[in-house]
Amino acid sequence: MRKFIILALVSLIAAQTYAVSKAQADSAYVREDYAAAAVLYDSLLTAEGPSSEIYYNLGNCYYKTDEIAKCVLNYERALLIAPGDDDIRFNLELARSKTIDRIIPHHEIFLVTWWRSLVNMTDADTWGVYAVGAFVAMLLLLMFYLFATSLWVQKTAFYSGVVLLVLCILFNICAWSQSDKQFNRTGAIVMSPSAVVRSTPSASGTDLFVLHEGTRVEILDDTMTEWKEVQIADGKKGWIEKKVISKI
């Protein structure tokens, strides 16, 4: 009992500390002291761990100070946690419009685009809740099917149960896809004003193209210490120094 009370007090103090620190950061932002607000939001992330709200606020600070690479990075991190948040997505597109590189994504089939949009409607936890809800509803319909005396009720329960089973499977796949994106992050943002992408993981490699700050890349090969093989949205690939990018 004593341990429980101590744990509860520690949790309460931590929550109050977080609330005070966030209030200070919010206050600095309202005063238009964006640099101070950014430091405070960053310290909250260090102390409390990832939060879509704090990443979003931090991105707003960097947008105001015209640090576009950091802005894009934090919006991307916020969107990874809360993929269904329209405000984050809008601000991310706004920040991207201020980057130098204009990369036209390669064409993909409709089903791939549709599936990505579906999965990104919400986060893994919410998809999991939907899956549990569909499963429970399916079990209730199974009870109706087994014990109903009306043939019409049995048929309705059976076909509705099949639909819910399919939805349960679909929701679980969506939850897994979002969870996989969280734990196997391949996206990164170019943080340097400019970065050369080379044909080989060496400074002596042939220059293929140049990327600028704020551009997103996907890491294809993460095995080397100093170099990463990356791909941009139009399908071009090459090697870039690790020090000029930050993982989302």
Regions found by a protein language model. Give the residues of each.
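SH3/SH3-like beta-barrel superfamily modules
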Residues: 208-242
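Internal/C-terminal transmembrane anchor helices
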Residues: 154-178
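Membrane-embedded alpha-helical segments of integral membrane proteins
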Residues: 107-147
